[in-house]
Design a protein with these regions (language model features):
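Condensing-enzyme catalytic core mediating Claisen C-C bond formation in acyl metabolism
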Residues: 1-27, 151-166, 240-311, 319-320, ...
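N-terminal extracellular/periplasmic Venus flytrap/periplasmic-binding protein-like
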Residues: 13-15, 25-35, 43, 156, ...
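Conserved beta-ketoacyl condensing-enzyme motif
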Residues: 25-113, 117-143, 212, 218-228, ...
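Short, well-ordered amphipathic alpha-helical segments that serve as non-catalytic structural scaffolds
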Residues: 29-44, 68-72, 97, 176-183, ...
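Conserved catalytic cysteine-centered active-site region
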Residues: 58-113, 156-158, 171-174, 233-261, ...
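Active-site-proximal alpha-helical scaffold in enzymes
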Residues: 89-119, 127, 184-213, 268-275, ...
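Flexible glycine-/small-residue-enriched beta->alpha junction loops
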Residues: 112-182
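Active-site pocket-lining segment
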Residues: 296-379
Length: 425
């Protein structure tokens, strides 16, 4: 059996994240991902190199994006002989792409690879009416011009109504925010705790920018030099003034302030074998040790939509002989402040850990001072497929700065899924 190799995280690059319909309103997925890729090429002197592979993806895609990642490679200064493919696992896309590339490096199939993702809600795909689509296909199948005209004469004004992207789970009809509101009610997560976590995210990220932390993590794009969702002057008073966004009654606790906004952006990470990195004189910030994905039955199983990482982490810990407390940093994606707090509360709940996770004892509490120490999605924003790359690069840099340590990544995703990983130095 092939001896598995350690997978080095060499570094990352992203463009600043932007709130939807802002600076990137006219930027396509391809333009943003290519910009992030070009920045990575420049940072690590990859010009003209044939990379093992590039794996990336987007949650919201136009039909023109059917070969998105490969087109970005062809539009970059990488060798055109670099293979590339698309990945999509909702908000877990970027991290899942990194795990796919890492597995090939570990097995010796490739020496290096690039992984990440991109998303835009500003340039969201708007489809043709389903009735119009079927009529056009029927007309295309018709043999004669007369038959084609007969079909096209069935067109009516309602066929011109466009098909807009839906903000809801197909199986339930509820938005992610509505699902998370139900989770917050189930786990009795107070509004004040959610607002406090949101405030800490903004404060931590503002401090990181002030110290120049992001200088080697991103490259400017379309005039933007930092994430424009960041609010350095945010306060609990400002957060408390916001109205509930998903539940209008007095039960509502999720607001625009403690939930991530719709965001545009792209991110990538460069991975490689130790030998490849050293041969090229590239840094090794940390190592991607292992990953685990999970899914829950949020439709019929009485489980919260965004609780899958709660299930993935204990499997990951057991396989690696670790406990939840064996980490120096915790990077938990802040889709909503309530999701993070539900996750932490579930791991501390003995009955839940026994009946749902099959554990003899609860995983326990974490040291909150180690959680999202440079800020996370509530401050940066959340371009769905791009969040994983941002988190991997940020955590690897944290471990490199510390000189040692171990970090845990947890990312919830639509469809009741979650992707988790361990990074160590």
């Amino acid at each position: 059996m092939t001896q598995l190799r350690r997978v080095a995280i060499i570094g990352g690059n992203r463009i600043p994240f932007a709130r939807s319909n802002g600076p990137y309103a006219t930027a396509s997925n391809q333009a943003m991902l290519t910009a992030a890729l070009e920045g990575l090429i420049e940072r690590f002197n990859l010009h003209g190199l044939r990379i093992g592979e590039v794996a990336a993806g987007a949650v919201l895609k136009h039909s023109r994006d059917f070969n998105l990642t490969r087109e970005c490679v062809l539009g970059s200064r990488l060798s055109p002989q670099t293979p590339a493919y698309d990945v999509q696992q909702a908000c877990g896309t970027g991290l899942e792409a990194a795990l796919l590339v890492a597995n090939k490096i570990a097995l010796g199939q490739i020496e290096c690879g690039i992984a990440g993702g991109v998303d835009t809600t500003s340039d969201a795909p708007i489809g043709v009416n389903e009735g119009l689509r079927k009529l056009l296909l029927q007309a295309n199948r018709s043999k004669s011009m007369a038959d084609k005209l007969k079909v096209l004469l069935q067109l009516r004004p309602h066929h011109l109504k466009p098909q807009l992207p839906r903000n809801g789970e197909p199986r339930t009809g509820l938005s992610m925010g509505q699902h998370c509101e139900l989770m917050a009610q189930t786990w009795q997560i107070p509004r004040a705790e959610q607002d406090q976590l949101a405030l800490e995210s903004h404060r931590n990220m503002a401090a990181a920018y002030a110290e120049g932390w992001h200088n080697d993590l991103l490259t400017p794009f379309l005039g933007l030099t930092r994430d424009n969702n960041l609010r350095p002057d945010l306060s609990l008073e400002k957060l408390a003034a916001l109205k509930p966004a998903f539940e209008r009654s007095e039960k509502g606790t999720l607001t625009a302030g403690n939930s991530t906004p719709l965001t545009d952006g792209a991110s990538l990470v460069l991975l490689g074998s130790e030998a490849w990195a050293r041969e090229r004189g590239l840094p090794i910030l940390a190592y991607l040790r292992d990953g685990e994905a999970a899914a829950v039955d949020f439709v019929n199983g009485a489980e919260g939509l965004l609780m899958a990482p709660v299930y993935a982490v204990p499997r990951l810990l057991a396989r690696n002989g670790l406990t939840l407390q064996d980490f120096d940093y915790y990077e938990i994606h802040e889709a909503f402040a309530a999701q993070v707090l539900c996750t932490l509360k579930a791991w501390e709940d003995a009955d839940y850990c026994k009946t749902r996770l099959g554990l003899e004892a609860p995983l326990g509490a974490i040291d909150r001072s180690r959680l999202n120490v440079k800020g996370s999605s509530l401050a940066a924003g959340h371009p769905f497929a791009a969040t994983g790359g941002r988190i991997v690069a940020n955590l690897a840099k944290l471990l490199d700065a510390a000189g040692k340590g171990r970090g845990l990544i947890s990312i919830c995703a639509a469809g009741g899924q979650g992707v988790t990983a361990i990074i160590e130095r």
